[in-house]
Every structure is written in structure tokens, then in C-alpha cells.
From Swiss-Prot:
HAMAP family from the UniProt entry: Hydroxylam_reduct
Protein name: Hydroxylamine reductase
Lineage: Bacteria, Bacillati, Bacillota, Clostridia, Eubacteriales
UniProt-annotated binding residues for hybrid [4Fe-2O-2S] cluster: 244, 268, 312, 403, 431, 456, 491, 493
Entry note: cofactor: Binds 1 [4Fe-4S] cluster. Binds 1 hybrid [4Fe-2O-2S] cluster.
Catalytic reactions of this protein: A + NH4(+) + H2O = hydroxylamine + AH2 + H(+)
Organism name: Clostridium perfringens (strain 13 / Type A)
GO terms under biological process: response to hydrogen peroxide
A Gene Ontology molecular function term of the record: peroxidase activity
Xref: Pfam families: Prismane
PTM-bearing positions, type Cysteine persulfide: 403
Amino acid sequence: MSMFCFQCQETAGCKGCTVRGVCGKTEDVAKIQDLLIFVTKGLATVANEGRKVGIVDKKVNRMIIDNLFITITNANFDFKAIEKRVKDTLVAREELKERVQAKGGNPIGSDFKGCATWTATTSEEMMEKASQVGVLATENEDIRSLRELIMYGLKGLAAYMEHAMNLGHDKEEVHAFMAETLVKILDDSLSADELTALALETGKFGVDGMALLDEANTSTYGHPEITKVNIGVRNNPGILISGHDLKDLEMLLEQTEGTGVDVYTHGEMLPGHYYPKFKKYAHFAGNYGNAWWLQNKEFASFNGPILMTTNCITPVQDSYRGRIFTTGAVGYEGCIHITADENGYKDFSQIIELAKTCKAPTEIETGEIVGGFAHNQVLALADQVVDAVKSGAIRRFFVMAGCDGRAKSRDYYREFAEKLPKDTVILTAGCAKYKYNKLPLGDINGIPRVLDAGQCNDSYSLVVIALKLAEVFGTDSVNELPISYNIAWYEQKAVIVLLSLLHLGVKNIHLGPTLPAFLSPNVAKVLVENFGIGGITNVEDDMKMFLGE
């Protein structure tokens, strides 16, 4: 069986990639990722049985999290690294089995699809199995759709859990749920209704995961605050850090202090500037470039080393191949991968030494952008915001969180932001902001018309803000507030955000630029009928719809 992947918005023809991923992953990489998911379900099976006899292994929890994160779109293209993880997972599974058996447990449980017992000794055996366990192994279209909706939610949740765990914050209940759910989506006895309920329950734990990460980030680095971020360059050599992991950012800033090397953020690392703890670093120079999909040009013109801490990495170009490093879940064949020691410390000295030999970044723009409007900062402005709503100065909020991407159709979001009436405010998080965060959209009574809460996980902040506004205005539901949801999605973190919003009862969310290919017509119908999920059409008609005109 050839590869099949339809987990991201850009999947071929909005149906699925079957020869090579639009993201750039090869058939072999797609298949080894499928196999990694399969053996991770096997490890989860044994972990579930372990919990029944009192065995909770934090290393196993971490392995499950890391395995899921690695398979997120644009995270890891390194076949050998993923194959090694498959082998390591099989070893961990067998070791855990022995411990469960010694405690009197049944280590393989129901062993759905043989995931707790299958093994291999050669690469050929692995690839043969990989061809049998992909998405299309589930023949029923609706069951497949629901299973993948849940699976992609778990992948997004895994990303948020990994970042929280890197900062020493954890929640066993989330790990237990994830392991149980990985096994349930192999269970052919579960009906579509039961899987739909499981998808919403995944959203509940998505909220827990985002809350945990918010606590981890803010307790470690302080609450984000209103910040102006330089988008120009200095004359020193620099290191560009991309992705989402704030712990990696902290270690890089510590190690570059006093070296004469500046640090710039890229993409989803931009919100690092909003945290008080990072403002003490004079060499934290600014943000370089835009969203992930423009990295081919921007990494070339940056001139210095690039550190990818998480997705999104795209196929590496010759113009910067010798300057790009990966860490964490990221991998790309031929790039140096930096691992942490047993204490979580990463030595970035080789990146720093390389930076010293490089030219300063080439300037591609100048000026400043403003962000830092996470829940704590916005609630500090609550009186000002409430007064503006009551006076009519603010007519409506538009949640335009989510992702950016290559598709020309995403220009819709820039045009939508430009044409919004001057009495509206955009609430955003994630890299979708790059479509409009540099536009001169002005302010309302001193409140910027684009309030950037931060990274995609900071969509949690937008939920907290909405719930607080509902409380202030005395409404029974966030759906009664003057808030519309026009969200751009791309990958699996957007899926867990969506499921979290649905769990919280948010209705009438519009997704674009296309609805997910993994939603079968029947599953899409359920989401439309029960939650008011919709797509987008064109700016003029959609704006009339949102504004009730």
C-alpha cells in the first residue's frame, strides 16, 4: 500500500497525499511515522494495564508524548531517527510488560490489532508492517474520520504537554487519558456516537493541557505583558530560534549572553518577547521574518545559524543547509540534532561558535509590532474593554487565531482583517497573526485592534478572556457575547484547540481556508448540525454574515 496522509490543511486536492507529502515528507517517512503511531498504541496498551496494578512510569509517559509530537506536520523528516524511535518503543514496551506481569497484571490487555505483541528485527519487516497500519487500515469512512479527528487532537495535546513537561509541570490524569484513548481508537466495537463523545472528551483534556502549559509558562517566565518588538536588525551576528519551546529559548539566551551574538525569534517564537523574564537579555534583538512557510527565503537572508525547536521545518535548502540545527521533536536528515542531557540541559556552543563566523542578518523590514495580550494582560484592561463595549466603541470581537500557510487562498484572512469595520477588534494567537499583525489597523480608545495573545497554545488565553467577558456581562454562555470565530487551521495543534472550544460549548466556529479532508461528509454534518461549524466563502459575504448585515 502506498502512503496516505491527510492530517494537514494543505493535503493534496483536499483529499490526501499518496505519493509525497505536500509538506515534503517521502513515502518512507510517512510510513515509518504510521508505524511509530502503531507501536505507540502498543506501548499505551501496556501502560494502561500497568496503571491497573499501580505502575505509572513517567519515562513511558514521556515516550508516548514525544512519539506523537514527532509525527505532527512539519516536525520530523528524518527516517533513521524515527525508525530508531520505533525500535526504542518496542524495547520499552517489552520491559514494561515484564514489570506488569511481575505485579500479576495482564500486560497485553485486549491487544487490539496486535499492537502490544507485534515485533520486528529488520527494517524490511518494519516497512512491511508500516504498509498495513496506516490511516486506510480503517475501512469505514466515518469511523476512520472520527478516529483520525481524535488522533490528531492527541498529537496536538502531546505538543502542549511536552512543552509543559520541559518546564517541570505535568499532569498524570492527562497521560492516563491519552494512553486509554490511543487504545480505544483501535477498538472496532466503539460506535460512531461513542467516538464522537470521545472526541469531545479529548477536547476536555485539551483544555487541561493548555491550562497546564499556561501555568508552566507564566509561573516560570511571568505573565505576558504589552510589548513592542523590533522587526529590524542590528549589526552583530545572530542566531534565529524558531518553533515554540520557551525552555530552549531560555537556554539559548543564557548561553549567548556576553558572546557578542544576538538572538532573534522567528515564527511562533515571537511571543517569547512578551514574557518579563526574557526582557533582561539586552542581546534579545527582535523578531526576524514571518510565518513558517516563508523560511526558505528568510533563513537564507538571515545569514546566521537557525535553531528549530519544534515544527514547522520545511525541506531544507542548500542556501542555509549548513546553518540549520534541530532539537526536541524536530529532525531533518543531514542536520545536526542537539539533545538534552539527563538534567534537560542542552549545549548550544557549536551554534554559538558558528554564529561568530557569520555575517549579521540582512535587513528585510523595519519597525515594531505590538503583542502580549494574553489573559492576564487583557483582564488588567477589563474595565477599559468593558466600557468600550458598553459605549459601542467596540461592536464585536473576531477570534482569528490559528495557523498560516502557503495557500494563496489564505490571503482571505489579510483582506478580512483589512476590511473589518473600525469598531471591531481581532483576538489572535498562533502564526495566523502574520497575515495582519503588520497592517496599520489602529486602535480603539487606546486598545489596539489586533490583540495578540501569543502562540497557538495561547488560544487558551482567548478562552479565559471570553469566559471572563461572559461573567462581566452576565450572559449564560460565551455564544451570547459579541464574539465571532473565523479561524485559520493548518495542523494538529489547531485540531486540539478546536476540540477544546467544542468541549467548552463554543458554537458557530468557521474554519478555513478549507474544512479538514479527514472529516467525512457524515462527520462534518454532525459538526455542522450540533456545533454550527462552517467554512468560509469570500470576504464580503462572510463579513455580512458575521456582522448580521
